Amino acid sequence: MTKKPDLNDPVLRAKLAKGMGHNYYGEPAWPNDLLYISPVVILGTIACNVGLAVLEPSMIGEPADPFATPLEILPEWYFFPVFQILRTVPNKLLGVLLMVSVPTGLLTVPFLENVNKFQNPFRRPVATTVFLIGTVIALWLGIGATLPIDKSLTLGLF
C-alpha cells in the first residue's frame, strides 16, 4: 500500500514548489538516471578497470616446462577446502561423504530455524552460528591446503 500525497495541502504544495519532496514521492528514471547517471557509472567502471590493467598488469604465470613437474600441484583457490578434506581424510569414500554433507547440512538449516521470517541475523541464531562456524572451517581448510601435509591441520601453529 503506497501513500498518496494530498496535493491540496498548502504545506506540501509549498515544499513541491521549492523542489523538495521529489525523493519521497519518486523521481522518474528518464532522463535523470538513464541519461546522465548510468553512463557516468559505466564509463567510470570501465576507466577503473583499464587503469588497473595498465598500472598493475598481472602475469599469466610461469612458462610451462614439460620436463619439470612441480612437487605438489595445487588446485585453484576456491577448491582449497575440498582439496584439504580429500588430502587429510584417509578413506576417500569418507572424504566424498564429508563433501556431500556440507550442502546437505546447509539445506537443513531453514528447517531447524523457527523464526525464519526475520532478516536480522541476531534474530536467527541457528543460521548465524552455522554460517560463522562454516566460514571459520572453510578458512581453516583453505589455509591448511597451502601448507605441507604435516602442518596442514594445525596451520603450523602447534
Curated annotation (Swiss-Prot):
Family note: Belongs to the cytochrome b family. PetD subfamily.
Assembly behavior: The 4 large subunits of the cytochrome b6-f complex are cytochrome b6, subunit IV (17 kDa polypeptide, petD), cytochrome f and the Rieske protein, while the 4 small subunits are petG, petL, petM and petN. The complex functions as a dimer.
Species in which this protein is naturally found: Liriodendron tulipifera (Tuliptree)
Gene assigned in the entry: petD
Protein's UniProt name: Cytochrome b6-f complex subunit 4
Main localization category: plastid
InterPro entries (alphabetical): Cyt_b/b6_C, Cyt_b/b6_C_sf, Cyt_b6/f_cplx_suIV, Cytochrome_b_C_euk/bac
Entry membrane topology: Multi-pass membrane protein
Biological process according to GO: photosynthetic electron transport chain
TM ranges: 34-54, 93-113, 129-149
Keyword ATP-binding: no
Keyword DNA-binding (UniProt): no
GO molecular function per UniProt: electron transporter, transferring electrons within cytochrome b6/f complex of photosystem II activity; electron transporter, transferring electrons within the cyclic electron transport pathway of photosynthesis activity; oxidoreductase activity
Known role: Component of the cytochrome b6-f complex, which mediates electron transfer between photosystem II (PSII) and photosystem I (PSI), cyclic electron flow around PSI, and state transitions.
First and last residue of the signal peptide: none
GO cellular component: chloroplast thylakoid membrane
Superkingdom per UniProt: Eukaryota
Localization per Swiss-Prot or TrEMBL: Plastid, Chloroplast thylakoid membrane
Keywords assigned by UniProt, alphabetized: Chloroplast, Electron transport, Membrane, Photosynthesis, Plastid, Thylakoid, Transmembrane, Transmembrane helix, Transport
